[in-house]
Amino acid sequence: AYAAARGADRMSSYGDWVALSDTCDVHTAKLLQREVSDGIIAPDYTEEALEVLKTKRRGTYNIVKIDPNYVPAPIEHKDVFGVTFEQGRNELKIDEAMLMQNIVTENKELTEEAKRDLLIALITLKYTQSNSVCYAKGGQAIGVGAGQQSRIHCTRLAGNKADIWFLRQHPKVLNLPFVDNIRRPDRDNTIDVYISDDYEDVLADGVWEQFFKTKPEPLTREEKKEWLATFSGVSLGSDAFFPFGDNIERAKRSGVQLSLIHISEP
């Protein structure tokens, strides 16, 4: 689960906090060991996991244990410049039943994969700053657009991230001849530039030698378009309604299967 969540956006290269809903085992700790991270919070840790995590950041890695039985207050309070705001805590229950409440298209069937991905998208949105849109596929979030002033900007931002997620799986990208011992953040950042229109920034003479053993061929715009045209089976969630059809049109370009109603709102 951690690997899938991390893979949603590899450009979080220089620090994050990891939140786990279950005990951190040694396998998760070893995955985390090689990533740049500022801390982890979880209900418990195995002894083996603790030994691994204690080696991060020369022993200064933040490891926080939470009470899994803690129940927060139903009313939240926030103070802003001396003014106190109160609001009910978001206790929305996201489950399969809510997906089946109001299917408006002729096709009323959702595959098990679609249900899983829609639930993942909606759970992600529950804890994401509004306005927000999430694309999901294969049991993981692949693009999140958050905190935008308009819904279409959320859809575009999340769609662009989903496209990048898929482009990272292009055969040319998977076979890039990186130099030995390249740092993981450098590799991720190099891939991000390579698949963009600014690929010359990493392929120019005198530059590519820093990252590659041999100079790769660029991933052309035509190749990217052809690859993205095969992108399908994506689910999409939104934390509010779509006011205009432009959101639907943009989502479709990133593989959202509208015929299966892969769009949901909590």
State where each predicted segment sits.
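ATP-dependent carboxylate/acyl-activation modules
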Residues: 1-258, 264
